[in-house]
Amino acid sequence: MTTLTAQQIACVYAWLAQLFSRELDDEQLTQIASAQMAEWFSLLKSEPPLAAAVNELENCIATLTVRDDARLELAADFCGLFLMTDKQAALPYASAYKQDEQEIKRLLVEAGMETSGNFNEPADHLAIYLELLSHLHFSLGEGTVPARRIDSLRQKTLTALWQWLPEFAARCHQYDSFGFYAALSQLLLVLVECDHQNR
């Protein structure tokens, strides 16, 4: 990625972690349709590989703003996609895709982090991977830890996530009838792919 700073990429990961970790509340729903978010989306679109995915997400948000009971509908989508059985869902856990659920724990230890007691999900939840990537990008920008060490851990995390993220995103597209979470997963997929290539 050429135009986004490490801190900006960290913010995108943190934002996506939040959206994949719990249902949107009224405040978040208002925020994603705000002028401030439109500016943020414009910044993301300055990164050519992200432009199409951001446009798709903006289209979903525009449709969402005229949807009756948007928050309740999105909550139902979230529940159906991420909290039900895996028959017609996109479970946000590495272990749901036959991946080693212990890998993220090892990566967190290596980063000097641990999961919060406030987050009542297994450690292999997608949001944990995204929070770790956010932390690593912020650390790159601070310069307090050798960049080579952070970058090595970032690459390990991206590799572990990439083992199952494409299937997760495909399942979001398959089962998210409205498309908001499908669009979010597509943005995440492109972001991770770009980040992984930016060695």
UniProtKB/Swiss-Prot annotation:
Matching Pfam families: Nitrate_red_del (PF02613)
Stretches that traverse the bilayer: none
UniProt entry keywords in alphabetical sequence: Chaperone, Cytoplasm
Cellular component terms (Gene Ontology): cytoplasm
UniProt record, GO biological process: protein complex oligomerization; protein folding
Compartments reported by the entry: Cytoplasm
Keyword set includes Lipid metabolism: no
Function noted in UniProt: Involved in the biogenesis of TorA. Acts on TorA before the insertion of the molybdenum cofactor and, as a result, probably favors a conformation of the apoenzyme that is competent for acquiring the cofactor.
Official protein name in the record: Chaperone protein TorD
Organism of provenance: Escherichia coli O8 (strain IAI1)
